[in-house]
UniProtKB/Swiss-Prot annotation:
The lineage of its organism: Eukaryota, Fungi, Dikarya, Ascomycota, Pezizomycotina. Residues 1-24 are annotated as: Disordered. This is Protein bli-3. Induction: By blue light. Pfam families: Pyrid_ox_like. Residues 1-11 have a biased composition (Polar residues). InterPro entries: Split_barrel_FMN-bd, Stress-Dev_Protein, YdaG_split_barrel_FMN-bd.
Length: 209
């Protein structure tokens, strides 16, 4: 398998991806990068969780609500039915992606990591929400009732490895104006702060939280 990337153009000494170069935010300290990302994820709550289907090998996404964060905001917890297909996927391949989008502002986040399925009742009870009963149902056997002691109720813990995200720097009027200017001048629009959190930065953060 070749490690060479894809290219369809030679731009010489000009940036091949001028939008990224114009918006990449590399001067922000790590604590701000983490805190801004964590705030964005918790405020949006709903994400798309992508796993590799254990039967077909294809990527599969589904909407999941963020239940809580750990390790100073970098690790994510989600409620899960332990008998669902996604737990089979994660047993087969622990690699996972979690993405968030604010469709109003255009802000987004993508978290790559590894996931584990946790059935520890203390953790389940800590983050249990009565609304989960609507998704688990009560099977009427006195055990599988959708409550915190229901063995089907588990937690998916996602440990971040890397993250990429974008937060808005302008309101909608400013964005439209900047994009319009870009169409006329060919200058890339500067509408977001693109930030990257490396594997080394994640490890450094986790060691102190």
């Amino acid at each position: 398998m070749s490690g060479q990337g894809f290219s369809n153009a030679d731009t010489g000494n000009k940036p091949a991806d001028p939008y990224k170069q114009a918006n990449l935010d590399t001067e922000v300290p790590l604590d701000q990068k983490i805190n801004d990302l964590s705030s964005f994820m918790t405020s949006n709550k709903f994400s798309m969780m992508t796993t590799r289907d254990s039967k077909t090998g294809y990527l599969l996404s589904r909407c999941m609500a963020l239940a809580a964060t750990e390790s100073g905001g970098i690790d994510l917890l989600f409620h899960t039915n332990t008998e669902s297909g996604k737990t089979d996927d994660l047993k087969s391949d622990e690699h996972i992606n979690i993405s968030f989008l604010n469709s109003t502002t255009g802000d987004w986040a993508s978290v790559s990591g590894t996931a584990s399925i946790v059935t520890d009742r203390d953790l389940v009870r800590k983050h249990y929400n009565p609304h989960l009963k609507a998704w688990f149902g009560d099977l009427g056997d006195g055990v599988h009732d959708g409550g915190p002691e229901d063995p089907r109720v588990g937690v998916i813990r996602v440990k971040m490895v890397t993250a990429h995200y974008a937060i808005s720097t302008k309101n909608i009027v400013g964005k439209v104006a900047d994009v319009a200017q870009g169409v006329i001048t060919g200058k890339p629009a500067t509408v977001n702060k693109l930030r990257e959190i490396s594997e080394q930065e994640v490890q450094s953060w986790r060691s102190s939280h």
